[in-house]
C-alpha cells in the first residue's frame, strides 16, 4: 500500500461528503491511503456528546456507506466517533 498523501482537493472532498451527513457536527481528522486505483479512509467524525452508543454507531455506518458509495473510488472507510467539543 502506498503511503503517499493524496492531493488536498481529494481530502477536502472526503471531508465534505462526511460533513454533510446528518448527525456529523465536525471532522476531527482524516487520513487517506491509496492502493492501486482505490483509496482507504480513516476518518474521525464528531457527534453530539450526549449521543448514545447506538446513535454514534448508526452515524458511523451511514458515513461509511456514503463514502464507499461515492464516486471517489473509496474501497473501505473506518469511521471513528468522537464527541463534539463543548463550547
Which stretches of residues belong to each language-model region?
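Alpha-helical transmembrane segments and adjacent TM-loop junctions that form the membrane-embedded core
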Residues: 1-87
